[in-house]
Amino acid sequence: MDPGWGQRDVGWAALLILFAASLLTVFAWLLQYARGLWLARARGDRGPGPALAGEPAGSLRELGVWRSLLRLRATRAGAAEEPGVRGLLASLFAFKSFRENWQRAWVRALNEQACRNGSSIQIAFEEVPQLPPRASISHVTCVDQSEHTMVLRCQLSAEEVRFPVSVTQQSPAAVSMETYHVTLTLPPTQLEVNLEEIPGEGLLISWAFTDRPDLSLTVLPKLQARERGEEQVELSTIEELIKDAIVSTQPAMMVNLRACSAPGGLVPSEKPPMMPQAQPAIPRPNRLFLRQLRASHLGNELEGTEELCCVAELDNPMQQKWTKPARAGSEVEWTEDLALDLGPQSRELTLKVLRSSSCGDTELLGQATLPVGSPSRPLSRRQLCPLTPGPGKALGPAATMAVELHYEEGSPRNLGTPTSSTPRPSITPTKKIELDRTIMPDGTIVTTVTTVQSRPRIDGKLDSPSRSPSKVEVTEKTTTVLSESSGPSNTSHSSSRDSHLSNGLDPVAETAIRQLTEPSGRVAKKTPTKRSTLIISGVSKVPIAQDELALSLGYAASLEASVQDDAGTSGGPSSPPSDPPAMSPGPLDALSSPTSVQEADETTRSDISERPSVDDIESETGSTGALETRSLKDHKVSFLRSGTKLIFRRRPRQKEAGLSQSHDDLSNATATPSVRKKAGSFSRRLIKRFSFKSKPKANGNPSPQL
């Protein structure tokens, strides 16, 4: 045999074996691929999600390269592992706010679903059913996922849930309402949760039962059979209504996904510090006032003998306020105000219009629902909403309910008090003191002290000074010094008392009137108390003997004048005093002229307590005189009037030898009584007090009081 032939046979045999191995390899890959398709189709009938999620990770290597790529793609795009999703839901339900919002959304959806049946028997879930501690969520899987949506399925199981249900039965004769206690036993039930991302708002979460669960209900009335009315609702009917509401409802809630700004350099694992804006975590109690309730276009078929009332109900905390009955008609208005306490979870306000007949029966005509509790809403607004007719009732096509909503923040207050948005005036009384001082050429100092006391009114009453200390503001003007040329008279001091100006004014009186009537720097008449005090002081070098003689003569003349006045008022004829120490007619008439008019302000009793006593007045150096004049509003006010009795009292003081510090210009002490009458008109140390007191016009022109 040729040896070359044997080598060629071995080469061909190796090639054949290699070809057969290749065919077997390709055939094996085809079998694996077919097996994978068959398994996927078989498991697709039971749901692709659980099949993909339930297989172990080792199966990815058994199905070949293509199947592994497909399975990896499905794992990344679709199903998540059960422990991860379950941990996410468990973390969300660990937060109290999320759990409360979830329960509240469920109860709200149950009430809405119960109102859609249109039956004469209406049920309402009054309280949020608390999920028992032994409730569990298991077998969480992701069955569908896209860019903005995700569908999860889980198994919910709980032992017992207890909650009250209010049942309202409406009939043409009457309306009855009873409360029932419901005990719900929930067997393991499959729940489908839909997650949808809404741009700009957050994550919308909705859930519903995939199949009708076998619910076990126990309904018991709150009242005993003897306490209940004659017409009772069958318990089986209530059970069916509750079951239909639970199974058919699909609650939904919104979760905020907005990012919060954190300080720079914050480590994710560390606990973020408390931000300043997060300090007022506890909401303040608010109140909601309902005013000007008005129902319009109710229809003309309402009888005049019936009455309508409005009921306001708040969802959380549950509150109910009733208005007084009003006569029925096409348009009804309730004038009283209703106050409701808002809580952090208050969301809806329901207004119901009830009709009551003469026999005492009530029935629901219509109702309207308003959203409340939003911080972005204005504090006060007018709301108009349509009325939904009650079961078996027909209202007008344009039946509406109008109400004015008024929010008040902070602690509850009475109606009519100002809200927090209204700026309230300060309760601290203020007192402003203005000093105006003028120095005459002859050395006489004319000082005007104007005191303006403000006592702000709160609720129409004055605050107590003992509880609100006064705030004193002292303003002193620049002292004015009049020279010999600029003064009203360029004569000497001794002759300035005798020679007046052409209009009859004394230079000191003219300065005093100018200071009292000068409007510059005076505050507007916005306070209940305003008082001006005039102080005229000066120094004249007069011998002591002349000063004492003038004081004695003036004191004796004033006493004689007072005795004669008393005798004249008792009925006996008497002549007027021959030489009273009164003002000369010239200055008096000038002071009574319109030039010296000063508008009087209303005074309070507190002004009386602030007046200086006689001892304070007499403590001044020299001769003093105190007088009060009446003030009639919008009439002329004269600071000094003829006939005013001035009693000069002299306190013993040390004087310089040969000189006197009297306020009277007694340079002509030995002159005639008429000269002394003029000279005694103004003293250099005279304190005149003006207290404006409004008296009735019937009193006429009373004599001033000393």
From Swiss-Prot:
UniProt topology in membrane: Single-pass membrane protein; Peripheral membrane protein
Positions of transmembrane segments: 10-30
Chain positions with Phosphoserine modification: 59, 358, 374, 411, 464, 468, 470, 613, 619, 623, 638, 660, 662, 674
Superkingdom of origin: Eukaryota
Record topological domains on the Cytoplasmic side: 31-706
Compositional bias annotation for Low complexity: 417-430, 477-494
GO terms of molecular function: insulin binding; phosphatidylinositol binding; phosphatidylinositol transfer activity
Regions of this protein lying in the Lumenal compartment: 1-9
Biased composition (Pro residues): 574-584
Domain C2 residues, every copy: 268-389
Annotated spans, Disordered: 409-430, 449-504, 564-635, 648-682
Phosphothreonine PTM sites in chain numbering: 417, 419, 428, 621
Domain SMP-LBD stretches: 76-260
Region (Association with the cell membrane): 415-706
InterPro entries: C2_dom, C2_domain_sf, C2CD2/C2CD2L, SMP_C2CD2L
Subunit structure: Homodimer.
Protein name per UniProt: Phospholipid transfer protein C2CD2L
Species assigned in the record: Homo sapiens
